Structures are given as structure tokens and as C-alpha cells.
């Protein structure tokens, strides 16, 4: 049976992962990357036709209609123009991954910092 992971398991992947030991959060490079990421998310949310065209460029075996359905199902509901993550979805995902790995879970808001 073929299945898409997003049909069964939701992990918010919006954002940028930074190890503050190597790249301080307030560094100009990290801040520039955050701004670029937010611009990209805003474009995906505000210009769905552009996003669908881009997705189609690397999922080139899919028809335009299939790519549009993909966007509507896996992109539009989860990628917001402001880059914020739904912490309820994130909590469920973090707990599920921790359970699968047999490790203690951590607070989702510790992973998905909204202060940047």
C-alpha cells in the first residue's frame, strides 16, 4: 500500500533550525535567513498559482490538477503567511516522535520559537 506521510503524521516544518552555540539567534545572518523564510512563506500563502507552478517544476510527473490538489492538501493548510506554527499540531507531532523513539517529549514551544 502506498501512502503519503502527511496523510497519517503531521509535523510542522515551517521555519529554520538554528543551534545557538554555533549561530547566535540575534546574528545578522540568522535574522536575514528568518526574513527570507518569512518572505517565501508569504509568497506561498498569498500567491498559490506561483507556489503551484514551482511545486510542479520538481514534481514534474504530476499533472497541474494533481499538483494543485497536493498544494491544497499539504501546503495551504499548514504554511501560513506569517510563518507561525499551530502549536497543537506541533505538540502532537513532538509527542508522537518522542514515543516512537522511546525518549521523553519536550514542549513544542521550546522547539518552535515564535519570538523571531
Show where each model-derived region lies.
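Generic structural "secondary-structure junction" signal
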Residues: 18, 81, 87, 113-114
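Short, structured secondary-structure boundary patches
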Residues: 5-6, 20, 85-88
Amino acid at each position: 500500500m502506498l501512502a503519503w506521510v502527511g496523510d497519517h503524521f503531521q509535523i510542522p516544518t515551517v521555519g529554520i533550525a538554528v543551534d545557538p552555540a554555533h549561530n547566535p539567534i540575534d546574528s545578522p545572518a540568522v535574522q536575514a535567513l528568518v526574513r527570507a523564510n518569512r518572505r517565501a512563506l508569504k509568497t506561498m500563502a498569498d500567491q498559490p498559482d506561483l507556489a503551484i507552478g514551482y511545486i510542479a517544476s520538481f514534481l514534474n510527473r504530476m499533472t497541474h490538477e494533481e499538483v494543485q490538489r497536493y498544494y491544497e492538501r499539504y501546503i495551504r493548510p499548514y504554511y501560513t503567511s506569517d510563518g507561525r506554527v499551530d502549536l497543537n499540531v506541533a505538540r502532537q507531532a513532538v509527542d508522537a516522535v518522542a514515543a516512537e523513539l522511546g525518549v521523553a517529549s519536550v514542549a513544542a514551544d521550546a522547539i518552535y520559537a515564535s519570538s523571531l
